[in-house]
Design a protein with these regions (language model features):
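Short, surface-exposed secondary-structure edge patches
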Residues: 27-32
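Short beta-strand-centered aromatic/proline hotspots
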Residues: 49-58
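Contiguous surface segments at macromolecular interaction interfaces
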Residues: 77-122
Length: 122
């Protein structure tokens, strides 16, 4: 719950304007991010915090994600080193849960978004 609240707060404040997911972890029929899509961001309790619209979608290998993208993710000290360390832990656990092996060349979906609506329910 805490991490959900923290991430939603970063998005609402306009600090977090990007996110990354691992392409290989999507289910076969699961929709991938695409430009123009609207997303409801939930807080840690599952309540709507805001609505975002996807502006940019790129598929980039994990080890090629840029410092600029890491900065726009808005987490920690916003450095590429922080981004890599945190996403490495997250992706390793996610890949292990799917009985797959993580490697640094995995394709990542790097998404940039803007906030188009903020919930007034806090």
């Amino acid at each position: 719950q805490k991490i959900g609240d923290e991430l939603a707060d970063l998005i609402v404040k306009g600090i977090k304007t990007a996110t990354t997911s691992a392409l290989e972890l999507y289910e076969p029929n699961e929709k991938k991010p695409k430009v123009g899509t609207y997303n409801i961001v939930l807080d840690g309790s599952g309540h709507p915090a805001c609505i975002t619209q996807t502006k940019v979608v790129e598929t980039i290998n994990f080890n090629q994600v840029s410092a600029e993208h890491a900065y726009h993710e808005g987490e920690g000290d916003r450095s590429l080193a922080y981004w890599r360390a945190e996403h490495l832990k997250f992706f390793q656990a996610a890949y292990q849960a799917m009985n797959q092996t993580f490697h640094e060349q995995i394709p990542c979906i790097c998404e940039v978004f803007t906030v188009v609506y903020v919930s007034d329910k806090k």
